Structures are given as structure tokens and as C-alpha cells.
Amino acid sequence: GETKPARATSEDMEHFQTIFAKNEGAVTAPATGLHFSRELLKRMEIKGIESAFITLHCGLGNFHSIEVEDLTKHKMDSEQMTISAEACSIVNSAKQKGHHVCAVGTSVVKATETAVGTDGMLKEYDGWTNKFIFPPYDFGLSDCMIANFYHPMSTLLMSTAAFGGYDLVMEAYQLAVKHGYKFGCFGDAMLILND
């Protein structure tokens, strides 16, 4: 007989949800956020690490392969996002104090790069973005990023390569394969520092 596609269970729905999810609207979770637990956020807070939260309505476009050689011709699906005044205040204050600004995932990088001003400060934003970040790209806000190990030919991998440098990211991916790291939504992640 014909095999039916597996249906998501309530347990699947719980595991594929970030702990800070509040607003309905995303088709998929911003998967890098899945690495964070309430305990980890509390430990970060105790160490004086502030967190700013934004709303991302991630779409299925993140899973489309890049099928063009000229990356400027790749069309991104639009995604809705909201960056509040409170989030801007936390991020901009950290930046002005010389602290690191760490984006959790490529969707956050896409959102913040959409909303960063020419002065390097994050601006309030409530709208849509179809920004496609690929090498070379001059980042205006974050100086570090946590990124999952994404699949080849994906826009997510291109954004990661733009942030960490293509050669260094490809070297990290080769090591990840060699050492059996997991790729994709429930896979492993890396921290990229750009000082």
C-alpha cells in the first residue's frame, strides 16, 4: 500500500516551539532558538546577559534551495516581523556600552539587518522583509551569532557564510561532518564571533 505522511503529534508541536514563542503566525520555528531553555536564559540573566525579544513569523521559504548561480537573482519569500521599542532599547544600550550583540539565528540577523539604521542602531519595525544576506555582506548590528548547521544550497547557510566568512564557515562544516555533528532544525549549533 501507499505510505501516508506522518502527522505531527502534540509532543512534536511542543518540541518544535521555542520557549519564548508568544505570537501565532510563523509556519516554522526560528530553529536556533530551540537550543535555549528557561534554565539557560535564567543562568544568562544571573551572569548579567540581557535578552531582547523580537517577533519573527518565519516561513517555508527558508527551506527552498538556491537554484541560481547569481545569488542576486534568488527571490526570497517575505516574512513578517516586529521589533519593539523595548527590544531596540536593550540592544542599543548594550551596543553603546561596548557589549557584544549576539543574534540567535539567521532569521534574527535578517530581521535586525532589515531594521538597523545607518547609525548602526536598531530601529522599531513592524512589517515585512525579503532580505537575502549572502557573502560579501557588511553587517550593521550584531557582532556575534549563534547559527545551526544548515543544509547545503540553503539561504540560511549563505547568511551564516556571510557572517562568519565563507572559508571559515566551510571549514567548520567540514569539521562538523567529520565529527558527526547533527544538521538541520534539531541539530547542533555554533557560535560565530566577529570582533
Report each predicted region and the residues it spans:
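Surface-exposed, charge/polar-rich loops and edge strands
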Residues: 1-195
